[in-house]
Protein backbone atom coordinates (compact mmCIF):
# COMPACT_ATOMS: atom_id res chain seq x y z
CA UNK A 1 0.00 0.00 0.00
CA UNK A 2 1.38 3.41 -0.99
CA UNK A 3 0.92 6.60 1.03
CA UNK A 4 1.58 10.14 -0.29
CA UNK A 5 3.69 12.17 2.08
CA UNK A 6 1.27 14.92 2.99
CA UNK A 7 -1.98 13.02 2.99
CA UNK A 8 -3.25 12.93 6.61
CA UNK A 9 -3.27 9.48 8.13
CA UNK A 10 -5.92 9.28 10.84
CA UNK A 11 -4.35 8.15 14.03
CA UNK A 12 -5.85 5.54 16.19
CA UNK A 13 -4.95 3.76 19.33
CA UNK A 14 -2.06 4.84 21.32
CA UNK A 15 -0.11 4.28 24.40
CA UNK A 16 3.15 5.23 25.88
CA UNK A 17 1.69 3.75 28.97
CA UNK A 18 2.68 6.32 31.47
CA UNK A 19 0.54 5.53 34.49
CA UNK A 20 -0.10 8.21 37.01
CA UNK A 21 -3.03 7.81 39.19
CA UNK A 22 -3.64 7.85 42.83
CA UNK A 23 -2.11 8.92 46.32
CA UNK A 24 -1.27 9.35 50.51
CA UNK A 25 -3.61 9.64 53.48
CA UNK A 26 -6.75 7.60 53.90
CA UNK A 27 -10.01 9.45 53.39
CA UNK A 28 -13.26 8.13 54.85
CA UNK A 29 -16.53 7.79 53.04
CA UNK A 30 -17.96 10.90 54.67
CA UNK A 31 -15.50 13.16 52.76
CA UNK A 32 -16.22 14.69 50.68
CA UNK A 33 -17.71 19.30 29.30
CA UNK A 34 -15.51 21.01 27.57
CA UNK A 35 -15.68 21.28 23.70
CA UNK A 36 -12.46 20.85 21.71
CA UNK A 37 -10.35 23.99 22.20
CA UNK A 38 -10.25 26.87 19.75
CA UNK A 39 -6.59 27.70 20.02
CA UNK A 40 -6.72 31.42 19.36
CA UNK A 41 -9.41 32.11 21.93
CA UNK A 42 -8.44 33.35 25.36
CA UNK A 43 -10.08 32.67 28.69
CA UNK A 44 -12.99 35.02 29.34
CA UNK A 45 -12.75 36.94 32.57
CA UNK A 46 -11.83 40.21 34.17
CA UNK A 47 -10.27 42.81 31.91
CA UNK A 48 -6.56 43.13 32.65
CA UNK A 49 -3.88 45.66 31.88
CA UNK A 50 -1.98 45.60 28.61
CA UNK A 51 1.41 43.94 28.86
CA UNK A 52 4.34 46.25 29.38
CA UNK A 53 7.20 44.91 27.22
CA UNK A 54 10.32 44.26 29.25
CA UNK A 55 12.88 44.16 26.45
CA UNK A 56 11.06 44.03 23.07
CA UNK A 57 12.50 40.60 22.32
CA UNK A 58 10.90 37.14 22.40
CA UNK A 59 12.45 34.91 25.05
CA UNK A 60 11.95 31.36 26.31
CA UNK A 61 13.07 29.51 29.40
CA UNK A 62 15.88 26.96 28.95
CA UNK A 63 18.32 24.90 30.96
CA UNK A 64 21.90 25.90 30.05
CA UNK A 65 23.31 23.01 32.07
CA UNK A 66 21.38 20.32 30.21
CA UNK A 67 21.77 18.82 26.76
CA UNK A 68 19.91 20.29 23.79
CA UNK A 69 19.88 16.87 22.14
CA UNK A 70 16.20 16.10 21.35
CA UNK A 71 16.79 12.38 20.88
CA UNK A 72 18.32 11.97 24.33
CA UNK A 73 15.51 14.22 25.64
CA UNK A 74 17.12 14.93 29.01
CA UNK A 75 15.55 18.34 29.72
CA UNK A 76 11.83 19.07 29.59
CA UNK A 77 12.59 22.80 29.35
CA UNK A 78 14.85 22.35 26.32
CA UNK A 79 12.48 19.84 24.71
CA UNK A 80 9.80 22.52 24.61
CA UNK A 81 11.41 24.24 21.59
CA UNK A 82 13.09 21.29 19.87
CA UNK A 83 10.90 21.63 16.75
CA UNK A 84 12.45 25.03 16.03
CA UNK A 85 15.86 23.35 15.69
CA UNK A 86 14.99 19.93 14.27
CA UNK A 87 12.61 18.37 11.78
CA UNK A 88 10.76 15.22 12.80
CA UNK A 89 10.29 12.10 10.73
CA UNK A 90 6.50 12.55 10.94
CA UNK A 91 4.35 15.27 12.49
CA UNK A 92 1.16 14.64 14.46
CA UNK A 93 -1.35 17.45 13.99
CA UNK A 94 -3.97 18.70 16.43
CA UNK A 95 -6.67 16.56 14.76
CA UNK A 96 -4.54 13.44 15.36
CA UNK A 97 -3.65 13.09 11.67
CA UNK A 98 -0.09 12.54 10.53
CA UNK A 99 2.00 14.13 7.80
CA UNK A 100 5.65 14.61 6.93
CA UNK A 101 7.84 17.19 5.25
CA UNK A 102 10.81 14.82 5.39
CA UNK A 103 9.28 11.59 4.09
CA UNK A 104 7.98 12.02 0.55
CA UNK A 105 6.40 8.58 0.29
CA UNK A 106 5.94 5.48 2.40
CA UNK A 107 4.72 2.01 1.44
CA UNK A 108 3.73 -1.21 3.17
CA UNK A 109 1.77 -4.20 1.93
CA UNK A 110 1.45 -5.97 5.27
CA UNK A 111 2.07 -3.13 7.81
CA UNK A 112 5.12 -5.04 9.06
CA UNK A 113 7.70 -4.27 6.35
CA UNK A 114 7.76 -0.52 5.71
CA UNK A 115 9.75 1.42 3.10
CA UNK A 116 10.23 5.20 3.43
CA UNK A 117 11.60 7.65 0.86
CA UNK A 118 12.95 10.99 2.07
CA UNK A 119 13.53 14.45 0.59
CA UNK A 120 17.31 14.74 0.18
CA UNK A 121 17.08 18.42 -0.79
CA UNK A 122 16.71 19.16 2.94
CA UNK A 123 20.01 20.24 4.51
CA UNK A 124 21.50 20.42 7.97
CA UNK A 125 22.58 23.82 9.24
CA UNK A 126 26.16 23.13 8.04
CA UNK A 127 24.91 22.60 4.48
CA UNK A 128 25.18 18.80 4.52
CA UNK A 129 22.22 17.12 2.73
CA UNK A 130 19.92 14.99 4.86
CA UNK A 131 20.26 11.27 4.15
CA UNK A 132 18.22 8.18 4.91
CA UNK A 133 21.09 7.06 7.12
CA UNK A 134 20.57 10.15 9.31
CA UNK A 135 16.87 9.38 9.70
CA UNK A 136 17.42 5.68 10.41
CA UNK A 137 20.15 6.56 12.92
CA UNK A 138 17.86 9.02 14.73
CA UNK A 139 15.12 6.40 15.08
CA UNK A 140 17.59 3.74 16.25
CA UNK A 141 19.01 6.04 18.89
CA UNK A 142 15.53 7.14 20.00
CA UNK A 143 14.83 3.48 20.80
CA UNK A 144 17.48 3.80 23.52
CA UNK A 145 15.90 6.91 25.06
CA UNK A 146 13.38 6.44 27.86
CA UNK A 147 11.38 9.31 26.34
CA UNK A 148 10.62 7.36 23.14
CA UNK A 149 11.38 3.73 24.01
CA UNK A 150 7.84 2.53 24.79
CA UNK A 151 6.29 3.62 21.52
CA UNK A 152 9.30 2.40 19.49
CA UNK A 153 9.34 -1.03 21.14
CA UNK A 154 7.34 -2.20 18.12
CA UNK A 155 10.44 -1.91 15.90
CA UNK A 156 12.28 -5.16 15.11
CA UNK A 157 14.88 -3.71 12.76
CA UNK A 158 15.74 -0.62 10.71
CA UNK A 159 18.27 0.06 7.96
CA UNK A 160 19.04 2.60 5.22
CA UNK A 161 19.31 1.71 1.51
CA UNK A 162 21.08 4.39 -0.47
CA UNK A 163 20.82 8.09 0.28
CA UNK A 164 17.05 8.47 0.12
CA UNK A 165 15.46 5.21 1.32
CA UNK A 166 15.22 3.40 4.64
CA UNK A 167 13.16 0.41 5.74
CA UNK A 168 11.67 -0.67 9.05
CA UNK A 169 10.44 -4.09 10.14
CA UNK A 170 7.95 -4.14 13.01
CA UNK A 171 7.18 -6.96 15.44
CA UNK A 172 3.51 -6.99 14.50
CA UNK A 173 1.22 -5.37 11.96
CA UNK A 174 0.30 -1.77 12.76
CA UNK A 175 -1.29 0.32 10.03
CA UNK A 176 -0.75 3.40 12.20
CA UNK A 177 3.00 2.90 12.59
CA UNK A 178 4.00 6.26 10.98
CA UNK A 179 2.10 8.03 13.79
CA UNK A 180 4.67 6.61 16.22
CA UNK A 181 7.58 8.15 14.28
CA UNK A 182 7.17 11.67 15.60
CA UNK A 183 10.93 11.56 16.23
CA UNK A 184 13.40 14.47 15.85
CA UNK A 185 16.17 14.00 13.30
CA UNK A 186 19.82 14.55 14.16
CA UNK A 187 22.92 13.94 12.07
CA UNK A 188 24.31 10.42 12.06
CA UNK A 189 26.92 10.09 14.81
CA UNK A 190 25.63 13.04 16.89
CA UNK A 191 23.78 11.11 19.60
CA UNK A 192 26.37 11.95 22.24
CA UNK A 193 26.60 15.60 21.20
CA UNK A 194 24.84 18.07 23.49
CA UNK A 195 24.21 20.42 20.55
CA UNK A 196 23.71 18.17 17.52
CA UNK A 197 23.16 19.63 14.07
CA UNK A 198 19.56 19.93 12.90
CA UNK A 199 17.52 20.77 9.81
CA UNK A 200 14.93 23.01 11.51
CA UNK A 201 14.21 26.68 10.74
CA UNK A 202 16.52 27.82 13.53
CA UNK A 203 19.93 26.83 14.83
CA UNK A 204 21.64 27.47 18.14
CA UNK A 205 23.99 30.46 18.25
CA UNK A 206 27.67 29.93 19.02
CA UNK A 207 27.08 31.36 22.49
CA UNK A 208 24.22 28.94 23.02
CA UNK A 209 21.89 31.62 24.41
CA UNK A 210 19.65 32.23 21.39
CA UNK A 211 18.11 30.60 18.35
CA UNK A 212 18.99 32.23 15.04
CA UNK A 213 17.60 31.55 11.59
CA UNK A 214 19.08 28.57 9.78
CA UNK A 215 19.97 29.83 6.28
CA UNK A 216 19.83 26.28 4.93
CA UNK A 217 16.19 25.77 5.94
CA UNK A 218 13.50 26.08 3.26
CA UNK A 219 11.08 27.81 5.66
CA UNK A 220 13.50 30.18 7.38
CA UNK A 221 12.18 33.24 5.53
CA UNK A 222 8.63 32.44 6.72
CA UNK A 223 9.48 32.54 10.42
CA UNK A 224 7.94 35.38 12.49
CA UNK A 225 11.23 36.15 14.28
CA UNK A 226 14.87 36.37 13.27
CA UNK A 227 15.99 35.53 16.81
CA UNK A 228 14.49 33.69 19.77
CA UNK A 229 16.32 34.44 23.00
CA UNK A 230 16.91 31.90 25.77
CA UNK A 231 16.95 32.72 29.46
CA UNK A 232 17.88 30.53 32.39
CA UNK A 233 14.77 30.53 34.60
CA UNK A 234 14.90 26.96 35.85
CA UNK A 235 14.14 27.92 39.44
CA UNK A 236 10.35 27.77 39.79
CA UNK A 237 9.90 31.09 41.57
CA UNK A 238 12.34 32.77 39.18
CA UNK A 239 10.41 31.41 36.19
CA UNK A 240 7.08 32.71 37.50
CA UNK A 241 8.64 36.09 38.23
CA UNK A 242 10.35 36.23 34.82
CA UNK A 243 7.08 35.51 33.05
CA UNK A 244 5.14 38.08 35.06
CA UNK A 245 7.84 40.67 34.32
CA UNK A 246 7.83 39.70 30.60
CA UNK A 247 11.45 38.58 30.72
CA UNK A 248 10.19 35.34 29.16
CA UNK A 249 7.20 35.40 26.84
CA UNK A 250 5.69 31.91 26.73
CA UNK A 251 5.20 29.12 29.26
CA UNK A 252 3.40 25.78 29.23
CA UNK A 253 1.63 24.60 32.38
CA UNK A 254 0.05 21.30 33.38
CA UNK A 255 -2.87 22.25 35.66
CA UNK A 256 -3.64 18.59 36.38
CA UNK A 257 -0.11 17.56 37.31
CA UNK A 258 2.04 17.68 40.41
CA UNK A 259 4.03 20.60 38.95
CA UNK A 260 1.07 22.89 38.36
CA UNK A 261 2.32 26.48 38.70
CA UNK A 262 0.31 29.59 39.44
CA UNK A 263 0.72 32.49 37.02
CA UNK A 264 -0.93 35.90 37.28
CA UNK A 265 -4.01 37.08 35.39
CA UNK A 266 -2.35 39.47 32.90
CA UNK A 267 -2.02 36.66 30.38
CA UNK A 268 -3.72 35.02 27.45
CA UNK A 269 -4.28 31.34 28.09
CA UNK A 270 -4.82 28.82 25.33
CA UNK A 271 -5.34 25.09 25.64
CA UNK A 272 -4.10 22.19 23.59
CA UNK A 273 -5.28 18.59 23.75
CA UNK A 274 -3.21 15.64 24.89
CA UNK A 275 -3.61 11.88 24.67
CA UNK A 276 -3.28 11.54 28.47
CA UNK A 277 -6.40 9.65 29.50
CA UNK A 278 -7.77 9.52 33.06
CA UNK A 279 -9.82 6.43 33.79
CA UNK A 280 -11.19 4.15 36.49
CA UNK A 281 -9.79 0.64 36.63
CA UNK A 282 -11.17 -2.38 38.49
CA UNK A 283 -9.75 -5.48 40.12
CA UNK A 284 -11.78 -8.22 38.44
CA UNK A 285 -10.92 -10.63 41.27
CA UNK A 286 -12.61 -8.34 43.82
CA UNK A 287 -15.92 -9.77 45.02
CA UNK A 288 -17.46 -6.33 44.42
CA UNK A 289 -16.54 -6.16 40.73
CA UNK A 290 -16.85 -9.70 39.44
CA UNK A 291 -19.62 -8.63 37.05
CA UNK A 292 -19.71 -6.13 34.18
CA UNK A 293 -22.97 -4.73 35.60
CA UNK A 294 -21.29 -3.64 38.85
CA UNK A 295 -18.35 -2.08 37.00
CA UNK A 296 -20.51 -0.27 34.46
CA UNK A 297 -22.74 1.04 37.25
CA UNK A 298 -19.76 3.02 38.58
CA UNK A 299 -19.43 4.65 35.17
CA UNK A 300 -22.97 6.00 35.36
CA UNK A 301 -22.20 7.36 38.85
CA UNK A 302 -19.17 9.39 37.67
CA UNK A 303 -20.02 12.97 36.64
CA UNK A 304 -17.27 13.47 34.05
CA UNK A 305 -18.44 16.92 32.97
CA UNK A 306 -18.36 18.22 36.56
CA UNK A 307 -14.90 16.75 37.08
CA UNK A 308 -13.55 18.49 33.98
CA UNK A 309 -15.31 21.85 34.33
CA UNK A 310 -15.05 22.32 38.09
CA UNK A 311 -12.30 20.17 39.58
CA UNK A 312 -9.95 20.47 36.59
CA UNK A 313 -10.92 24.09 35.77
CA UNK A 314 -11.68 23.18 32.18
CA UNK A 315 -8.26 21.59 31.60
CA UNK A 316 -9.71 18.37 30.27
CA UNK A 317 -12.16 16.91 27.78
CA UNK A 318 -14.77 14.51 29.17
CA UNK A 319 -14.81 11.10 27.48
CA UNK A 320 -16.60 7.79 27.98
CA UNK A 321 -14.78 5.95 25.17
CA UNK A 322 -11.08 4.91 24.98
CA UNK A 323 -10.11 7.51 22.37
CA UNK A 324 -9.95 11.30 22.35
CA UNK A 325 -13.29 12.93 21.44
CA UNK A 326 -11.49 14.98 18.74
CA UNK A 327 -10.63 11.76 16.91
CA UNK A 328 -12.81 10.53 14.08
CA UNK A 329 -13.02 7.21 15.92
CA UNK A 330 -15.05 8.69 18.78
CA UNK A 331 -18.75 7.82 18.34
CA UNK A 332 -20.63 10.67 20.04
CA UNK A 333 -24.05 9.02 19.75
CA UNK A 334 -22.86 5.80 21.36
CA UNK A 335 -20.90 7.67 24.05
CA UNK A 336 -23.95 9.64 25.18
CA UNK A 337 -25.61 6.41 26.23
CA UNK A 338 -23.01 5.96 28.99
CA UNK A 339 -22.92 9.50 30.38
CA UNK A 340 -23.54 10.46 34.03
CA UNK A 341 -26.92 9.10 35.14
CA UNK A 342 -27.41 8.20 38.84
CA UNK A 343 -30.73 6.50 38.07
CA UNK A 344 -29.05 4.18 35.59
CA UNK A 345 -26.30 3.55 38.14
CA UNK A 346 -28.87 2.46 40.73
CA UNK A 347 -30.55 0.12 38.23
CA UNK A 348 -27.22 -1.39 37.19
CA UNK A 349 -26.19 -1.98 40.79
CA UNK A 350 -29.56 -3.64 41.42
CA UNK A 351 -29.01 -5.84 38.36
CA UNK A 352 -25.67 -6.83 39.88
CA UNK A 353 -27.48 -7.95 43.05
CA UNK A 354 -26.52 -4.91 45.10
CA UNK A 355 -29.47 -3.90 47.31
CA UNK A 356 -30.32 -2.71 50.81
CA UNK A 357 -31.01 -6.19 52.16
CA UNK A 358 -31.08 -5.19 55.85
CA UNK A 359 -32.81 -1.82 55.28
CA UNK A 360 -30.07 0.21 57.00
CA UNK A 361 -29.82 2.82 54.24
CA UNK A 362 -26.62 1.33 52.81
CA UNK A 363 -26.44 -1.24 50.03
CA UNK A 364 -25.16 -4.77 50.46
CA UNK A 365 -24.57 -7.74 48.18
CA UNK A 366 -25.27 -11.46 48.45
CA UNK A 367 -22.30 -13.83 48.38
CA UNK A 368 -23.34 -17.50 48.41
CA UNK A 369 -26.59 -16.44 50.02
CA UNK A 370 -24.92 -14.40 52.76
CA UNK A 371 -25.46 -10.63 53.04
CA UNK A 372 -22.09 -8.87 52.78
CA UNK A 373 -21.55 -5.21 53.61
CA UNK A 374 -19.92 -3.15 50.87
CA UNK A 375 -16.61 -1.42 51.57
CA UNK A 376 -14.91 -0.65 48.27
CA UNK A 377 -11.20 0.13 48.53
CA UNK A 378 -10.56 2.95 46.02
CA UNK A 379 -6.96 4.12 45.53
CA UNK A 380 -5.51 7.25 43.93
CA UNK A 381 -2.02 8.74 43.67
CA UNK A 382 -1.77 11.81 45.90
CA UNK A 383 0.87 13.59 43.79
CA UNK A 384 -1.80 15.26 41.64
CA UNK A 385 -4.34 17.53 43.31
CA UNK A 386 -6.65 17.30 40.29
CA UNK A 387 -6.73 13.50 40.40
CA UNK A 388 -7.31 13.47 44.15
CA UNK A 389 -10.21 15.92 43.83
CA UNK A 390 -11.73 13.88 41.00
CA UNK A 391 -11.39 10.66 42.99
CA UNK A 392 -12.98 12.29 46.03
CA UNK A 393 -15.91 13.43 43.89
CA UNK A 394 -16.45 9.93 42.53
CA UNK A 395 -16.15 8.47 46.04
CA UNK A 396 -18.75 10.97 47.26
CA UNK A 397 -21.13 10.14 44.41
CA UNK A 398 -20.89 6.41 45.11
CA UNK A 399 -21.54 6.91 48.82
CA UNK A 400 -24.59 9.04 47.99
CA UNK A 401 -25.94 6.01 46.12
CA UNK A 402 -25.40 3.86 49.22
CA UNK A 403 -22.25 2.21 47.82
CA UNK A 404 -19.87 2.36 50.78
CA UNK A 405 -16.53 3.44 49.32
CA UNK A 406 -13.31 4.46 51.09
CA UNK A 407 -10.69 6.46 49.22
CA UNK A 408 -7.01 5.87 49.96
CA UNK A 409 -4.73 8.69 48.80
CA UNK A 410 -1.35 7.00 48.38
CA UNK A 411 2.16 8.14 47.60
CA UNK A 412 3.39 7.08 44.17
CA UNK A 413 5.46 4.20 45.58
CA UNK A 414 2.59 2.93 47.73
CA UNK A 415 0.14 3.35 44.86
CA UNK A 416 2.22 1.26 42.46
CA UNK A 417 2.83 -1.34 45.17
CA UNK A 418 -0.93 -1.62 45.78
CA UNK A 419 -1.60 -2.03 42.06
CA UNK A 420 1.05 -4.72 41.68
CA UNK A 421 -0.18 -6.59 44.75
CA UNK A 422 -3.85 -6.30 43.77
CA UNK A 423 -4.62 -4.55 47.06
CA UNK A 424 -7.50 -2.49 45.72
CA UNK A 425 -11.00 -2.86 44.38
CA UNK A 426 -10.94 0.22 42.17
CA UNK A 427 -8.19 2.65 41.14
CA UNK A 428 -7.94 6.08 39.52
CA UNK A 429 -5.41 5.83 36.70
CA UNK A 430 -3.83 7.82 33.92
CA UNK A 431 -2.23 6.56 30.75
CA UNK A 432 -0.38 8.49 28.06
CA UNK A 433 -1.70 6.93 24.90
CA UNK A 434 0.39 6.79 21.75
CA UNK A 435 -1.17 8.27 18.62
CA UNK A 436 -2.37 4.88 17.33
CA UNK A 437 -4.73 4.71 20.36
CA UNK A 438 -3.50 1.22 21.28
CA UNK A 439 -4.42 0.26 24.86
CA UNK A 440 -3.77 -3.46 24.55
CA UNK A 441 -1.08 -3.41 27.27
CA UNK A 442 -3.79 -2.71 29.85
CA UNK A 443 -5.50 -5.99 28.97
CA UNK A 444 -2.78 -8.41 27.88
CA UNK A 445 -2.90 -11.49 30.16
CA UNK A 446 0.18 -11.35 32.36
CA UNK A 447 1.38 -14.92 31.98
CA UNK A 448 1.96 -14.36 28.26
CA UNK A 449 3.47 -10.88 28.44
CA UNK A 450 7.12 -11.66 29.09
CA UNK A 451 9.56 -14.37 30.03
CA UNK A 452 10.75 -11.97 32.73
CA UNK A 453 8.50 -13.01 35.60
CA UNK A 454 9.42 -9.88 37.56
CA UNK A 455 7.66 -7.74 34.95
CA UNK A 456 3.92 -7.92 35.42
CA UNK A 457 2.84 -5.34 32.85
CA UNK A 458 -0.15 -3.06 33.30
CA UNK A 459 -2.98 -5.56 33.41
CA UNK A 460 -3.87 -4.51 36.94
CA UNK A 461 -7.43 -5.69 36.31
CA UNK A 462 -6.00 -9.25 36.21
CA UNK A 463 -8.29 -10.08 33.32
CA UNK A 464 -7.65 -13.28 31.38
CA UNK A 465 -9.93 -12.25 28.54
CA UNK A 466 -7.96 -12.36 25.26
CA UNK A 467 -10.80 -10.58 23.46
CA UNK A 468 -9.32 -7.14 24.07
CA UNK A 469 -5.90 -7.94 22.59
CA UNK A 470 -7.47 -9.79 19.65
CA UNK A 471 -9.65 -6.79 18.81
CA UNK A 472 -6.70 -4.39 18.91
CA UNK A 473 -4.59 -6.66 16.70
CA UNK A 474 -7.39 -6.93 14.15
CA UNK A 475 -7.87 -3.17 14.11
CA UNK A 476 -4.17 -2.37 13.73
CA UNK A 477 -3.76 -4.86 10.89
CA UNK A 478 -6.69 -3.72 8.73
CA UNK A 479 -5.84 -2.62 5.19
CA UNK A 480 -8.79 -0.28 4.64
CA UNK A 481 -9.65 2.79 6.70
CA UNK A 482 -13.38 2.02 6.73
CA UNK A 483 -12.69 -1.44 8.17
CA UNK A 484 -10.30 0.03 10.74
CA UNK A 485 -12.94 2.47 11.86
CA UNK A 486 -15.49 -0.31 12.30
CA UNK A 487 -12.94 -2.40 14.18
CA UNK A 488 -12.29 0.47 16.54
CA UNK A 489 -16.00 0.83 17.21
CA UNK A 490 -15.97 -2.84 18.21
CA UNK A 491 -13.10 -2.10 20.62
CA UNK A 492 -14.99 0.85 22.12
CA UNK A 493 -18.12 -1.22 22.62
CA UNK A 494 -16.26 -4.15 24.15
CA UNK A 495 -14.33 -2.00 26.63
CA UNK A 496 -17.35 0.14 27.51
CA UNK A 497 -19.77 -2.74 28.00
CA UNK A 498 -17.41 -4.97 29.98
CA UNK A 499 -16.26 -2.05 32.14
CA UNK A 500 -12.74 -3.32 32.84
CA UNK A 501 -11.70 0.31 32.54
CA UNK A 502 -13.96 3.36 32.40
CA UNK A 503 -12.51 6.41 30.61
CA UNK A 504 -13.18 9.72 32.37
CA UNK A 505 -11.41 12.45 30.42
CA UNK A 506 -8.35 13.52 28.45
CA UNK A 507 -6.04 16.19 29.82
CA UNK A 508 -5.36 19.55 28.23
CA UNK A 509 -2.32 21.75 28.75
CA UNK A 510 -2.20 25.52 29.21
CA UNK A 511 -0.07 27.67 26.92
CA UNK A 512 0.31 31.15 28.39
CA UNK A 513 1.52 34.28 26.62
CA UNK A 514 1.26 37.97 27.48
CA UNK A 515 -1.71 39.88 26.13
CA UNK A 516 -1.40 40.74 22.46
CA UNK A 517 2.05 39.21 22.01
CA UNK A 518 1.23 36.11 19.93
CA UNK A 519 -1.59 35.09 17.59
CA UNK A 520 -2.04 32.20 15.17
CA UNK A 521 -0.94 29.66 17.78
CA UNK A 522 -1.81 26.03 17.00
CA UNK A 523 0.19 24.15 19.63
CA UNK A 524 -0.06 20.38 19.93
CA UNK A 525 0.93 17.84 22.55
CA UNK A 526 4.02 16.98 20.52
CA UNK A 527 5.00 20.45 19.32
CA UNK A 528 4.37 23.69 21.21
CA UNK A 529 5.61 25.65 18.18
CA UNK A 530 3.55 23.72 15.64
CA UNK A 531 3.27 25.76 12.41
CA UNK A 532 5.41 28.52 13.92
CA UNK A 533 5.63 30.13 10.47
CA UNK A 534 1.92 30.99 10.83
CA UNK A 535 2.33 32.77 14.17
CA UNK A 536 2.34 36.55 14.46
CA UNK A 537 4.57 37.99 17.19
CA UNK A 538 4.03 41.57 18.39
CA UNK A 539 6.71 42.97 20.69
CA UNK A 540 5.87 46.66 20.38
Give each language-model segment a name.
Residues 104-146, 288:
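Aromatic- and charge-enriched surface segment that lines or borders ligand/interaction sites
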Residues 216-261, 404-406:
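Ligand-site clamp/hinge motif
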Residues 212, 290-396:
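Append "and occasionally in soluble cytosolic enzymes with long acidic Gly/Pro-rich linkers
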Residues 4, 60-109, 140:
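N-terminal lobe/hinge region of extracytoplasmic solute-binding protein
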Residues 23-31:
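Bacterial lipoprotein signal-peptidase II cleavage site
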Residues 54-64, 113-116, 166-168, 200-205, ...:
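Short, well-ordered beta-strand elements
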Amino acid sequence: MRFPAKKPLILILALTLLMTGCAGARTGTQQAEEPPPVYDQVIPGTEVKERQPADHVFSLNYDPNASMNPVRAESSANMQFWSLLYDSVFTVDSDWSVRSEVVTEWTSDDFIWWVFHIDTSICFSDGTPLSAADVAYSIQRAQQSSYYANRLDIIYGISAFGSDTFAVTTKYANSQFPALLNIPIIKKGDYFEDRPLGTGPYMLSEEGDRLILNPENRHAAEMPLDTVYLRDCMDTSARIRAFEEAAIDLVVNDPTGMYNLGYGSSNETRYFDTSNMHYLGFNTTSMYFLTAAARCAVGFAADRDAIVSTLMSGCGVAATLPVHPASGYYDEDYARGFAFNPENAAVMFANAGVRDYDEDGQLEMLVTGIVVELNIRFIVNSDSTAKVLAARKICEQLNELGITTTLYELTWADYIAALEAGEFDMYYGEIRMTPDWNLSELFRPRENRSKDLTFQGMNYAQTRDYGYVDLYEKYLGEQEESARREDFQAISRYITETGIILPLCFERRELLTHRGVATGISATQYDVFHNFNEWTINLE
